[in-house]
A protein has these predicted regions:
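Metal-centered catalytic cores of metalloenzymes
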Residues: 1, 13, 22-25, 89-90, ...
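Mobile genetic element proteins and their domesticated derivatives, centered on retroelements
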Residues: 3, 22, 41-44, 78, ...
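Polytopic alpha-helical membrane proteins, predominantly small-molecule transporters/carriers
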Residues: 4-8, 70
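Active-site beta-loop-alpha junctions of metal-dependent nucleic acid enzymes
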Residues: 7-32
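Acidic/histidine-rich, metal-coordinating catalytic segments
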Residues: 32-51, 71-73
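Loop/turn elements at helix/coil->beta-strand transitions in domains of secreted/extracellular proteins
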Residues: 36-37, 63-65
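Short amphipathic alpha-helical segments
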Residues: 53-55
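Charged alpha-helix within mobile-element recombinases
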Residues: 57-58, 64-153, 159, 163-167
Length: 168
């Protein structure tokens, strides 16, 4: 429903940064909610995801999730994640310097996620992912709101690169 693949801002694309991102997500959600909602992480075989053990286990060594690597060129294995990537590309076109676009902080990541997930979807019968989350999982919705995700009114949704240039 709502995606978290680009929910956490990373300064660099390293295995250490990805583990720190999962650690942050766990701290945002809390252990119990994280274990319930992040049972699986599906990813490609990029070097930034090479520390499967660091992603799967928390700081005390307990299993917290399972990492599954998709086959190369098999976007069908990633489900709706590929659709989310298309929406991200409206705001952050491929081969564009993200810093030049203004994508330089967690605040900007939250802004992008807020706009993408406030947009009504046909496959959700005209509801947005955030509306569905609020209805189906109020605890998860509350944690995301506390972290800085917010609902954007339909007439204010922007899925263009200039979104990140604005002072939001």
């Amino acid at each position: 429903m709502i995606f978290v693949s680009h929910f956490i801002y990373h300064e660099e694309k390293t295995a250490k940064a990805m583990v720190e991102g999962v650690d942050l997500l766990e701290s945002i959600l809390g252990k119990e909610l994280f274990l319930k909602e992040v049972e699986v992480i599906k990813t490609d075989r990029g070097s930034e995801f090479s520390d499967a053990e660091g992603l799967e286990k928390d700081n005390d060594g307990s299993m917290r999730t399972h990492v599954f690597y998709c086959d190369p060129m098999a976007s069908c294995q990633k489900g709706s994640l590929e659709n989310n990537h298309k929406e991200i590309r409206y705001i952050c076109p491929k081969e564009t310097n993200l810093k030049v676009l203004g994508f330089d902080s967690q605040k900007k990541a939250n802004l992008m996620v807020s706009h993408i997930n406030s947009q009504p979807k046909e496959n959700l019968k005209g509801k947005s992912p955030l509306e569905m989350m609020e209805f189906l999982n109020p605890a998860l919705y509350k944690r995301f709101m506390e972290f800085g995700i917010k609902k954007i009114e339909n007439d204010e949704i922007i899925l263009k690169p200039y979104l990140l240039k604005e002072d939001n």
